[in-house]
Regions:
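Conserved TIR/SEFIR loop-to-helix hotspot centered on a Trp-containing motif
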Residues: 44
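Nucleotide and nucleotide-moiety/phosphate-recognizing core
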Residues: 1-41, 50-65, 72-77, 84, ...
Length: 124
């Protein structure tokens, strides 16, 4: 979703949520499949959806949860990999990854960013 910023900024504006309180969850090619990483702020990197969000929120100072989907396999184009279906072991593991991501979000809300980072920013 290369235009994710339209939705994110629209919701933040509608609900009058400052960018620092908008938590973005997104897939990340630079993390191994299933790895979770929480950051309090940062650049968009190479993620087009995050570029859109940064541009339209006008900030990089917002928290985010990155969910690893692994590197693009040889012979694939990034967009085909990102938009494709999970198969094999990854498809089987995906429900557990999503459960851990949901638990991570709950931890951020109930225990705060630092505690969640200490728990979830570990190697998978």
């Amino acid at each position: 979703m290369n235009r994710s910023g339209i939705s994110a900024s629209g919701l933040a504006s509608w609900y009058k949520i400052p960018p620092a309180q908008v938590l973005i969850v997104y897939d990340d090619l630079d993390l191994p499949f299933g790895a979770l990483r929480i950051r309090e702020r940062g650049s968009a990197g190479t993620h087009n959806g995050m570029r859109s969000i940064v541009q339209l929120l006008g900030h990089t100072d917002f928290p985010r949860l990155r969910i690893g989907i692994g590197n693009v396999p040889a012979g694939w184009e990034a967009f085909g990999f990102v938009l494709g279906k999970f198969e094999g072991a990854e498809a089987t593991a995906l429900p557990d990854v999503m459960d851990r991501a949901a638990d991570c979000l709950t931890s951020i809300i109930t225990s705060g960013m630092s505690a969640a980072m200490n728990t979830y920013n570990k190697t998978k």
